[in-house]
């Protein structure tokens, strides 16, 4: 779905630089100082309008969260929600996550969430998928011991591709779920897309995978 342009987005994000970190590369290795604690740090790549990361931050105040979203017209919605809730354990990055190692140091992150990522279904676009090998190499570097990558998607093709990619890149598969809502996981926090697709009866797929460290 094409997002409407919001001319005020740039100014709004600058005004809320206490939520949107403008130079994340300078914080590499020092995110705990920014949060002012040593709690685990979880990262969501592709946060959209922020429903998931806001819900997680409220549900788990003992965990720090960082959401990455490239589209200014979308991330402003997440920032507005965080500002309204006055949450201290979540920051947003208006960045392209093409190489997360530029923003995070080795072993600095405890969890990575990939929620309803673009499936890039054409073979020639395989390298753009966030579960492609070169991305997994980056995740391996920044994840600490026992750190997981958690994928949720409505796209079976991306799900199957990702499970294979995880395995081929040395990850242990901790969970494979082909109908997440059938198990009624009370800890599951839904994204906007997840609510939309699940109300239509579409199965939601989830996979949890981890590197051995």
Swiss-Prot record:
Keyword Transferase annotated: yes
Query: GO cellular component annotations, sorted alphabetically?
Result: tRNA methyltransferase complex
Enumerate the residues binding S-adenosyl-L-methionine.
44, 69, 96, 118
Q: Name one GO molecular function term.
A: tRNA (guanine(46)-N7)-methyltransferase activity
* This protein's pathway: tRNA modification; N(7)-methylguanine-tRNA biosynthesis
**Record's family?**
Belongs to the class I-like SAM-binding methyltransferase superfamily. TrmB family.
Record's function text:
Catalyzes the formation of N(7)-methylguanine at position 46 (m7G46) in tRNA.
Q: What is the protein name given in its UniProt record?
A: tRNA (guanine-N(7)-)-methyltransferase
Name its species.
Oceanobacillus iheyensis (strain DSM 14371 / CIP 107618 / JCM 11309 / KCTC 3954 / HTE831)
């Amino acid at each position: 779905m094409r997002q409407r342009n919001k001319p005020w987005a740039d100014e709004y994000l600058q005004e809320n630089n206490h939520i949107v970190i403008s130079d994340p590369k300078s914080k590499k290795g020092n995110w705990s100082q920014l949060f002012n604690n040593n709690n685990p740090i979880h990262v969501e790549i592709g946060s959209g309008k922020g429903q998931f990361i806001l819900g997680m931050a409220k549900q788990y105040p003992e965990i720090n969260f960082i959401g990455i979203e490239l589209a200014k017209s979308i991330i402003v919605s997440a920032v507005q929600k965080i500002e309204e809730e006055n949450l201290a354990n979540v920051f947003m990055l208006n960045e392209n996550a093409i190489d997360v190692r530029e923003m995070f140091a080795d072993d600095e992150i405890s969890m990575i969430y990939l929620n309803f990522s673009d499936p890039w279904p054409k073979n020639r676009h395989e390298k753009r998928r966030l579960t492609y090998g070169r991305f997994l190499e980056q995740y391996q570097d920044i994840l600490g011991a026992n750190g997981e990558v958690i994928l949720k998607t409505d796209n079976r093709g991306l799900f199957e591709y990702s499970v294979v990619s995880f395995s081929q890149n040395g990850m242990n598969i901790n969970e494979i779920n082909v109908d997440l809502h059938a198990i009624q996981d009370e800890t599951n926090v839904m994204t906007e897309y997840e609510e939309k697709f699940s109300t239509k009866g579409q199965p939601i797929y989830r996979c949890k995978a981890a590197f051995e460290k």
